[in-house]
Amino acid sequence: MKQIIKNIYYIGDNGCSVYLVDTQSDQGLLLIDAGMDLNMIKQIDSHGMKLKNIQHCIITHCHIDHIGICAELKRELPNIQFYGHALDAVPIEESGHDDRTAASWYGVIHEPVKLYQKFTSDTVLKLGSYDFQCIHTPGHTPGSISVLVESEGKKVLFGQDLHGPFNEGFLSNLQDYQMSMQKLLDLQADILCEGHFGIFQPASQVRQYIETHKHQNQTQFI
C-alpha cells in the first residue's frame, strides 16, 4: 500500500489495481473497484486504517477482475454501498453472464452483488469534502465509468482499463471508446490511476497514455 497524494492510496493489485480514498469524514473510506483478493484489502489495517471504515465502493465496470470479491466484501461489511453504471448493472447483480463479466476467461463463477446506486448519467458523489465525478466512459463495456477527484489542487483520474481490451462478449464499442477517451483528455487530469498498468503523472504523461491507446484502439477487437 502506498500513498499517491494526500488521502488517496494504491492498495495493491490482484486481478486489478485497487485504490482507496480517505474522505476524512464520517463517510469513511471509499474503494475504487475491489479486485479479487479480500486479504489484500484487509492489509489496510496494518497501515493505520480500518477495514470496518470502508463504507463505499465505486465499481468502474462489470468485469470479474474488478468485482470478484464484492459479495465477499458485503458479507464482511454489511453496510458497504456499491455504485456502478446502470448499463453494467445486470451482469453485476445477476449470475449467468460469464461473457459480460469475463468470469469465463478466469474460470471462476461470479457471485452477484446489489448496487446501492445505479448511475444513468455523469454523477457527482459527494463524500465529506470530496466530489467524486463519476463519468460515463463506455467502450470497454457499455457501463464503464471513470472517476475524477481533486486533492491538493491536483486532478486525479481513476481510469480503469483505458487500454481495453475490446470484445464482442463484453459488448465493447470502439466508436464509444474513441469519444470516451476524448472526454477524458478534455479533463486535463494531473494523475492517472489505471486499472492494470500503474500510475501516470504529471499531466503530460497522462495525456500521452490516453492518446496512445486512443490511437491504437481504433480497430483493435479480439
Predicted feature residues:
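Short Gly/Pro-enriched turn/cap motifs at secondary-structure boundaries
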Residues: 9-11, 114-116, 136-140
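Metallo-beta-lactamase
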Residues: 37, 124, 130-214, 221
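Conserved beta-strand hairpin/beta-sheet module of binuclear metal-dependent hydrolase folds
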Residues: 1-47, 146-162
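Active-site HxH/HxHxD metal-binding segment of metal-dependent hydrolases
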Residues: 37-41, 45-123
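Short Pro/Gly-enriched beta-strand edge/turn motifs at strand-loop
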Residues: 1-6, 103-107, 128-132
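Residue-level marker for buried hydrophobic side chains located in beta-strands
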Residues: 30, 58, 82, 156-158, ...
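Short catalytic-loop micro-motif centered on adjacent basic/acidic residues
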Residues: 29-33, 56-58, 134-136
